UniProtKB/Swiss-Prot annotation:
Cofactor(s) recorded in Swiss-Prot or TrEMBL: Zn(2+)
Keywords: Chaperone, Cytoplasm, DNA replication, Metal-binding, Repeat, Stress response, Zinc, Zinc-finger
Protein name per the record: Chaperone protein DnaJ
SMART domains with a match to the protein in the record: DnaJ (SM00271)
MF annotations from Gene Ontology: ATP binding; heat shock protein binding; unfolded protein binding; zinc ion binding
Co-factor binding details: Binds 2 Zn(2+) ions per monomer.
Length: 379
């Protein structure tokens, strides 16, 4: 049977961070650990989770897996030839001897300066409330970024003027440069610094962008925040980065989320935790208590004899997984609260309870004032 995708096994996206990988592994390993989960198949599930984590938590193994999958080299099911086996020349980019001499002399073969290039990627940090992260929302943001000049439409020249042959390189787009090296004086070619390799220069530069072809502006964007995003997660807005060069595509905008903590719940991945204080009578006799969930309030049955530390699990009452893998759970942690102030009647009843339980209570004062009273009374 074919192996499942490691990212699918852990329930994470392919661009998940190390923290997201670790968090997903901890949650799943705790759920399917053979010492905890006795269901059939839990052991195999745990092995699958551990194998996925072993690969994705290691940068080298993860890179190899992303490139080759389960059947590629580096122990994922097959041994194949990899260009990295010739590691002796990797420091020069694997481009052969021309690139070795290019790196040595700082010149040599150059990239085509007129080739199209993708624009730079940008990053924006968005702060969300707990509720916005859980249920999703749409927010408008304002960012400063380079955009194509509206005056010259990215050409760089003043409208109505034309370009002429570069006076520095005579239209070649590159110039000869001589350098002193350990092997003597070497002649190389470099991109023309005046026309940046285009071979042309403006008769008159655009008055708005001064020949750059771009201008820096404040841009408003609408960002749709998906349900279930967590702190430090990010989404990619394709084409919303800086404009490309020479007709290349624009870069992307990455929106990174900072999620404020909830005053009611504690979050761990898709699971949420709620602390519930119960009184001594409620814990001893049992009760039904109304508790909050993400969407409404539900009744929770507290069995008689419940102790501090008891945890109740409400399945699928947690947060929707941002990648669509169901819902997390709501865990209710119980704390039995000891009363700090009792009426005389309540004290009598407590003493009577202790006597019926075969206990002899040596009552102690609760504060300095009570202790002082007992001292002066000679008790």
């Amino acid at each position: 049977m074919a192996k499942r995708d490691y990212y699918e096994v852990l329930g994470i996206s392919k661009d998940a961070s190390k923290d997201e990988i670790k968090k997903a592994y901890r949650k799943l390993s705790k759920k399917y650990h053979p010492d905890i989960n006795k269901e059939e198949g839990a052991d195999e599930k745990f092995k699958e989770i551990s194998e996925a984590y072993e690969v994705l938590s290691d940068d080298n193994k993860r890179a190899s897996y992303d490139q080759f999958g389960h059947d590629g080299p580096q122990g994922f099911g097959g041994q194949g030839f990899n260009g990295s086996d010739f590691g002796g020349f990797s420091g020069f980019g694997g481009g052969g001897f021309e690139d070795i001499f290019s790196s040595f002399f700082g010149g040599g073969r150059q990239r085509d300066p007129n080739a199209s290039q993708k624009g730079d990627d940008l990053q924006y940090t968005m702060t969300l409330t707990f509720e916005e992260a859980v249920f999703g929302t749409t927010k408008e943001i304002s960012i400063r970024k380079d955009v194509t000049c509206e005056t010259c439409h990215g050409d760089g020249a003043k409208p109505g003027t034309s370009k002429k042959t570069c006076s520095y390189c005579n239209g070649a787009g590159h110039v000869a440069v001589e350098q002193n090296t350990i092997l003597g004086r070497v002649r190389t070619e470099q991109v023309c610094p005046k026309c940046n390799g285009s071979g042309q220069e403006f008769e008159e530069a655009c008055p708005t962008c001064h020949g750059k072809g771009t201008e820096n502006k404040t841009v408003k964007l609408e960002v749709k925040v998906p349900e279930g995003v967590d702190n430090e997660q990010q989404i990619r807005l394709a084409g919303e980065g800086s404009p490309g060069v020479n007709g290349g595509p624009a870069g992307d905008l990455y929106v990174v989320f900072r999620v404020k903590p909830s005053e009611t719940f504690k979050r761990d991945g898709d699971d949420i935790y709620y602390k519930l204080n119960v009184s001594f009578p409620q814990a001893a006799l049992g009760d039904e208590i109304k508790i909050p969930t993400l969407n409404n309030e539900v009744m929770l049955t507290i069995p008689a004899g419940t102790q501090t530390g008891k945890q109740f699990r409400l399945k699928e009452k947690g947060i929707k997984n941002v990648h669509g893998y169901g819902y997390g759970d709501l865990y209710v942690d119980i704390k039995v609260v000891t009363p700090t102030k009792l009426t005389d009647r309540q004290k009598e009843l407590m003493k009577e309870f202790a006597q019926l339980n075969g206990e002899e209570i040596n009552e102690q004062p609760s504060n300095f004032k009570d202790r002082a009273k007992r001292f002066f009374k000679g008790e």
